[in-house]
Amino acid sequence: MSLRRPNGFISAGYDPLEVPNAPTIGTASIASSTSVSVTFTAPANVGGSAITGYVATARKTSDGTTISGTGSSSPVTISGLTLGVAYTATVAAVNSFGLGVSSAASNSVTPAEFELYSWGNNYAGSLGLGDTANRSSPVQVGALTTWSNIAAGRASVATKTDGTLWAWGRNAEGQLGLNNTANRSSPIQVGALTAWAQVTSGGNFCFAIKTDGTMWSWGGNSYGQLGFSDTVERSSPVQVGALTTWSQISAGNYFTVAIKTNGTLWSWGKNNYGNLGNGNTDARSSPVQVGALTTWYQVVTGNNHTVATKTDGTLWVWGRNIEGQLGLSDTFSRYSPVQVGALTTWSQISAGGSGFTAAITTAGALWIWGRNNGGQLGLNDTVSRSSPVQVGALTTWSKVANAESHILAAKTDGTLWSWGSNSYGKLGLGDTDNRSSPVQVGALTTWSTLPKMPTSGFSLAISS
């Protein structure tokens, strides 16, 4: 690709109308531990001749040094970057007259390794390790370092930094999205589509949201949990409606709850405990709005209960409550959202399949309530609680993920901790003994991503 005119002079000395205008910058995202992928939109004005290619340039935010990559269309990959260093990117189009005007700078991105680890019950190959042997300590899933999002249910689903979708584990209802019902014991790419941004795995089905705001589902559908106004299983991803405004999704045992970009809350599927939040126990086979509010911020689901926060930091719950998992100081189920206490500082939430809930405040304190038969509340006993209780006095918790009967949590120092039921070694501590208080998992201090895994008997986590 030449950046000079035929007469040998560089384009900088020519009429700027001859070279292309600036492309419109999109986003820069991690493609590998040493490369980034840059998206953009071609300029409307191509200058004096057709565009022949593009040059994307990554600039270190620390000292301004640059490195470039070329391509014929969006996205362009820039390789040879330094691991752990922040960059922004610009893009310029090229025609026969030379290099055009550079775009505005992209978002900042830092190349990093994102390794996926798994442990615990390996039924149907749910750990992705190529076999069905249980593991009681974290084991890396393959050698890839480009995992970005993960979810665990009766199937495991994940996205990579290139936007591709992968799945493995149990597939009896087509929940791996591979157009068949054969189990897989190692990650398999789901179709050829990219731009997958968010995934969630329920009892026997999966959902995903793409970067364009569309929502897709596949797998079991006996209660209408896929949202298609029927109960027909799908063995590959199918778009749910035509909307492009979905921003967040969570799959429970046989129901689904989602938030749109306008802050409205929607639910569908099985509803025997009022877990859809619509004031009754009627199942729905397509999305139905929960109330009229437009201030919903975050939502998670357990087997049969739902937990959500609003933009004002308040915490709300509904659904099954036989174990006190709603945190309302009783064991009565609720069919519509009810606020938990008066706090307005809830920042991260998680719901466990067996009937327990965890939440972190903006101060970094971890609170928990509900069923405690395996010590999953982390309170040094096995007594259930029906209202929130703080786990110790620490204020350094950053992430929490409830599974069927155990918990994973990360601290601000990047360490990973686990507690609760330890059948199959799902706590990752090298044994199968239950723990009723937090115990550190190994010595790594780079745990960055925990999954939604409310129905899981195993563990997944990403280290970066």
Each language-model region and where it sits:
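Conserved core positions of repeat-based scaffolds
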Residues: 118, 155-158, 167, 205-208, ...
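Short glycine/serine- and acidic-residue-enriched loop/turn motifs that recur at repeat junctions
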Residues: 95-101, 117-136, 169-185, 218-235, ...
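Short, flexible loop/turn segments at beta-strand junctions in immunoglobulin-like
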Residues: 78-83, 192, 342, 393
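Short beta-strand elements bearing conserved aromatic residues within extracellular beta-rich modules
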Residues: 54-56, 165, 215, 265, ...
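Extracellular low-complexity, O-glycosylation-prone stalks/linkers
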Residues: 41-75, 90, 99-105
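Pro/Thr/Ser/Gly-rich low-complexity, intrinsically disordered linker/stalk tracts
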Residues: 11-50, 83, 97-113
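An edge-strand/N-cap motif at the start of beta-rich repeat modules
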Residues: 110-143, 147-150, 167, 172, ...
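Beta-strand-rich modules
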Residues: 78-100
